[in-house]
Amino acid sequence: MSLPGQIQSAIPSLPGFDCDTTLTASLAQKFFAQGYKFCLRYVSRGAESTQDVSQQEATDILNSGLALMPVQHVRKPGWSPSQSLGEQDGQNAVTNAQGVGFPAGVSIWCDLEGVDRTVQPQDVTDYCEAWFGAVNQADYIPGLYVGAGALLSGQQLHDLSFQHYWRSQSRVPDIPIRGYQMIQLFPSIQINGVAVDLDVVQDDQQGGQAQWLQVDVGP
C-alpha cells in the first residue's frame, strides 16, 4: 500500500527537522502548527525495528501537513565500508522504504559518518557507489548525508554519482560546483519533548532540490 501524497521538489528556505523518535499524529500536527514543514525519519539497515518509521507513522506525518523523506541508519562509529556492504545497505534501504509505502521518486538519504580512520578513501567511494546503484535502480533518488568522519574530501564527494547532498551540523567539506541541498543546524535541541536536529532546505548551485513526499492539506 502506497503512502498518501505526491512527490514534490523541496521549496528553498523551508524549516524542518530529523529525529530518531516515533512521531504520533498529535505530535506531527503540533510540529506543523509550530511552522515546521518537513521531517526525516529513519529506516533500518536490516529488518525494521520499532524505532524506525512505520507505514502508520508515515501516514500520520504526511496527513499533518509535514513533508517526509527517509534516511537510513548508520553503523556505530568505527565501521568499515565496502562495495558489498554498500550494495547490501542500499538494497535494504529500498526494501524498507517500499515496505513503508514510499513511492519511487522520493529522496532516500545515505548517512555517511563515523568511518574507521584507517579505511582507504576508495573503500568509502566503493560503498557509496554501490549504495547509490541499488537505490537508483529502484527508481528512488539517492541522497548523501555528509557527517563527521566521512573521510572523503569535497572533490571526492563531488566525484560520486550522487547529485543530492545534505550537510551535517559537523565540520564537513564544501562540495565544489554543486554544494548542498539541505543544511543541518547546530546544536541538536528538544522540541515537544522530542530530540531533533533542525534542517533547512535550499537549491544547490546546480539548481538541484531534494524530492519529498507531501500531502496538500490546504490553507
Residue spans for each PLM region:
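Aromatic-lined carbohydrate-recognition surfaces of secreted/lumenal glycan-active proteins
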Residues: 135-153
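Substrate-binding cleft of extracellular glycoside hydrolase catalytic domains
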Residues: 6-26, 37, 41-127, 137
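Active-site-adjacent substructure of cysteine-protease-like catalytic cores
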Residues: 124, 152-157
